[in-house]
Design a protein with these regions (language model features):
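Mobile cap/lid helix-loop segments that border enzyme active or cofactor-binding sites
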Residues: 1-66, 92, 187-190
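Short acidic alpha-helix initiation/capping motifs at coil-to-helix transition points
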Residues: 44-49, 79-83, 129-137
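Short amphipathic alpha-helical segments and their helix-coil junctions
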Residues: 46-60, 99-106, 137-145
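Helix N-cap / loop-to-helix initiation motif
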Residues: 62-63, 95-98, 148-149
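N-terminal hydrophobic signal/anchor transmembrane helix of membrane proteins
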Residues: 69-86, 153-170
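Helix-adjacent hinge/juxtasegments
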Residues: 81-115
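Acidic/histidine-rich alpha-helical segments that form the ligand environment
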Residues: 116-157
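Acidic, carboxylate-rich catalytic segments that either coordinate divalent cations
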Residues: 171-190
Length: 190
């Protein structure tokens, strides 16, 4: 269980509209803290679940498979164990193979097509761990061979929201971290 200092709303006290999100998150990760904490701000939780996930991540113009690849690459790079627990099944459900999941940390050498490699390279630029992230001319050429500028904006927005939500989840202590997670708060003074 996470050790967030924020108030949590148990499932029995959640509005009905959030039950599916709680059930899904708890079923995949065993840790529904995100839903329980953000239920205290229902408009924000609705934004995340309905506007971001339903309309943009699972909707939008770009094939969800590319968004799933980017999301998994970011969660692996950021070291979010809770995220990885839900993103691996999401990737598999979107048609990403186990071989691709296993190779996602070395995507240029992995079993990815050129469009997938371009998206993963873009994710590496958006990652919170990359302070020099940039859409170089070379990366833009790789992406634009497969995606319109509107698609690139959609992919970038999806990645930015996912990265930002991961960082917020780390700060609020809503998620478990992998042993290699680079986001570790300083030791509290004695």
């Amino acid at each position: 269980m996470t050790d967030t200092p924020l108030s949590r709303t148990p499932r029995a006290s959640l509005p009905e509209e959030f039950h599916l999100a709680w059930d899904t998150l708890n079923g995949l990760t065993g840790e529904p803290a995100f839903v329980e904490v953000f239920a205290t701000a229902p408009a924000v939780l609705r934004f995340v679940m309905n506007d971001f996930y339903a309309r943009l991540f699972f909707g939008g113009e770009v094939d969800n498979r590319f968004k799933q690849l980017a999301r998994l690459r970011l969660s692996r790079e950021h070291g979010c164990r809770t995220c990885n627990k839900q993103n691996v099944p999401g990737a598999l459900q979107a048609g990403i193979s186990q071989a691709q999941i296993d190779a996602i940390d070395d995507c240029e050498a992995g079993p990815f097509n050129e469009a997938e490699k371009a998206v993963l390279a873009f994710a590496d630029q958006v990652a919170l761990t990359n302070m020099q992230g940039d859409l170089s001319d070379a990366l833009y050429a790789r992406l634009s061979a497969h995606f319109s500028d509107a698609d690139i904006c959609e992919l970038g927005t999806v990645m930015a929201v996912i990265a930002g939500m991961a960082k917020l989840s780390f700060v609020l202590r809503l998620v478990e971290k992998e042993s290699y997670c680079p986001f570790v708060p300083p030791e509290a003074p004695a």
